[in-house]
C-alpha cells in the first residue's frame, strides 16, 4: 500500500492497530482506543488498495501477542464443508467453528480459549443431519468436541460450566445420545440432546445458558426453548437461518468476553481479541458483519475487535 495511505503508520508500535488491540507488535501495553461501545472497522476501496495485505500484516504482526484470527470470507472451504450436511451446517457455522478451533489452540499470553456457549448452539443444530438417527447426531456433535474445553489443564477446563471433567462430559453426552437408540426421529434426537446437555450443566453453566439462549427470540427467558428455537430457525433456512447464525456469532463473542472478564482472565489475559474478515463483501462476510452490527446497535457489548475489508469494483 502506498505510504501516503498510512499503511505503515497503522501497524507501527504506537499506531492505530496497537491501540485498537491494546498491545504493540513487540507486546508492550498500549492504551485502548474506544470504550465499551466498540465500533466495527471496515476498509473499503477498489482493486490495488492492498486491503487484504493490510489484514495479513495485522495478523502476522500482532497474533503472537494478542489472539487475532484472520478469516477469508470468500474461501470456498466453508461452503464445501457445509455441503456435506446442509441441514446441520452452513458456511457461517463452519466459519465460526474454524475461528473457535484456532482460538482453542492459541498459545499466547493467557492460553487457549474454551467455547461452551457456542458449543451448546452448534450441538443442537446437529439434530438436522440427513441420517436423523441419534448415532448420526452424536457423530455430528463430536466434530465440535474440542470447542468447550481448553487444551491446557484439561481437568480444570471450564469446570464451573459443566459438572465433572469436561472432556468426560462431552464423551458421556455422545454416549447418552447413541444409547437412546431413537431411530430416525430428529425431534426426539433433539430432545434427547437437550436433556443430556442440561443434565451436565453446573450451576454457573445453567445461569449462563439462561442469560444467553434465554434471550433468543421467542425463548421468554427459557434456555431450552431458546436452543430449540435456534435449531428450528436453522432448519427453516433463509432469514430465520440468518437469525440463528447471527446468534451463534454472539455466543462465540460471549465465550471470548467470559474468558477476559473472569477473575483468572482479568489477571492473565491482555489486550483485545481480534477477528479479521477479509472479503467481507461476500455473503458470509456480510452476514457476520450484519450480525455484530445489529447486536452492538441493540446494546450488546463485547471487546472483540472486528476489522473487515470490502472490495468495490468501481474503486
Report residues per predicted region:
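Walker A/P-loop-proximal flanking segment of P-loop NTPase domains
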Residues: 1-62, 71-72, 81-85, 89
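Conserved Walker B catalytic segment
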Residues: 7-32, 38, 243-313
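Short, charged/polar micro-motifs that form catalytic or ligand-binding hotspots
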Residues: 44-48, 85-89, 93, 234-246, ...
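P-loop NTPase Walker A phosphate-binding motif
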Residues: 46-79, 179-180, 184, 188-203, ...
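Elongated scaffolding segments in large macromolecular assemblies
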Residues: 51, 312-315
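Conserved catalytic segments around the Walker B and adjacent sensor/switch elements
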Residues: 60-89, 108-121, 208, 229-230, ...
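Conserved NTP-binding/hydrolysis module of P-loop NTPases
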Residues: 79-112, 222-225, 229, 249-260
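Coupling/switch/interface segments within P-loop NTPase motor domains and analogous charged loops
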Residues: 101-247
Amino acid at each position: 500500500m502506498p505510504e501516503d495511505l498510512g499503511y505503515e503508520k497503522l501497524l507501527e508500535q504506537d499506531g492505530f492497530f496497537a491501540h485498537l488491540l491494546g498491545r504493540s507488535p513487540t507486546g508492550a501495553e498500549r492504551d485502548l482506543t474506544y470504550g465499551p461501545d466498540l465500533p466495527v472497522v471496515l476498509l473499503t476501496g477498489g482493486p490495488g488498495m492492498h486491503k487484504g495485505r493490510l489484514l495479513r500484516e495485522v495478523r502476522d504482526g500482532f497474533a503472537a501477542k494478542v489472539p487475532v484470527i484472520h478469516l477469508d470470507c470468500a474461501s470456498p472451504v466453508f461452503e464445501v464443508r457445509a455441503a456435506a450436511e446442509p441441514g446441520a451446517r452452513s458456511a457461517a457455522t463452519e466459519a465460526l467453528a474454524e475461528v473457535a478451533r484456532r482460538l482453542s489452540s492459541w498459545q499466547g499470553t493467557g492460553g487457549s480459549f474454551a467455547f461452551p456457549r457456542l458449543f451448546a448452539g452448534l450441538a443442537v443444530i446437529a439434530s438436522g443431519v440427513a441420517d436423523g438417527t441419534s448415532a448420526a447426531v452424536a457423530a455430528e456433535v463430536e466434530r465440535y468436541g474440542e470447542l468447550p474445553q481448553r487444551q491446557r489443564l484439561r481437568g480444570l477446563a471450564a469446570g464451573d460450566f459443566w459438572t465433572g471433567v469436561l472432556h468426560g462430559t462431552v464423551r458421556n453426552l455422545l454416549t447418552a445420545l447413541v444409547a437412546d437408540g431413537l431411530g430416525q426421529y430428529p425431534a426426539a434426537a433433539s430432545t434427547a440432546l437437550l436433556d443430556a446437555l442440561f443434565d451436565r450443566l453446573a450451576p454457573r453453566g445453567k445461569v449462563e445458558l439462561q442469560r444467553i439462549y434465554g434471550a433468543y427470540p421467542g425463548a421468554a427467558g427459557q434456555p431450552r426453548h431458546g436452543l430449540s428455537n435456534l435449531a428450528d430457525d436453522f432448519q427453516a433456512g433463509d432469514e430465520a437461518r440468518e437469525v440463528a447464525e447471527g446468534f451463534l456469532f454472539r455466543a462465540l463473542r460471549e465465550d471470548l468476553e467470559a474468558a477476559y472478564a473472569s477473575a483468572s482472565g482479568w489477571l492473565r489475559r491482555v489486550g483485545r481479541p481480534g477477528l479479521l474478515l477479509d472479503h467481507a463483501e461476500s455473503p458470509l462476510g456480510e452476514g457476520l458483519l450484519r450480525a455484530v452490527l445489529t447486536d452492538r446497535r441493540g446494546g450488546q457489548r463485547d471487546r472483540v475487535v472486528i476489522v473487515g475489508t470490502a472490495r468495490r469494483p468501481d474503486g
